[in-house]
Amino acid sequence: IEHPAVKNPMKYLEEKGYEVTWLGVDEKGHISLEERANAIRPDTILVSTILVNNETGVIQDAAAIGKLIKEKNPNTLYHVDAVQAFGKYPIDVQKMKIDLLTMSGHKIHGPKGVGMLYMRKGLKVRPFILGGGQQKGQRAGTENGAGVAGLGVAADVAFRSMKESIEHVKEVKKTLMDGILAMPDTQVNGDGLEAVSYTHLT
């Protein structure tokens, strides 16, 4: 269920000798908390979860997952891919016990090519791109000031109208689903109205 932006780096790490555990999902696209608990070991470095699936809109229970991770191994970092959720689903990094969160500007009508990485305060991560000391030494290279400003405005607009947007999309989605499901041999994939924004049918 992971987006290639997360899945492919994990495959790369496997090629470099890291052990990656891949978990399956149930018929609605949810990862079993029990299966996840069994997969976390004393040497588990990172758990990564897509909060909202980019094809079905299925929502993973990020708060329950975060709680589980920290109970099983407080040293395991928790990354959440929030690209499809940001501005469309409430996110509380403290409540969800998130250490790292990523999002992309173009998914909230911001500029293309700009995104955000949230890092829990005090967390030290070795930079991937070396050079200057931009972004507090976490990523070298001159910042795209206009892109960052555009992302800030887009985020402000998204969060200001998020509650109303969620309710409006639910109404439109229900009308669409009712119409399509009235046709023979159709079914909803995923969680239906519980999913974010998307309607995925066959």
Per-range role (PLM):
Residues 1-201:
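Pyridoxal 5′-phosphate
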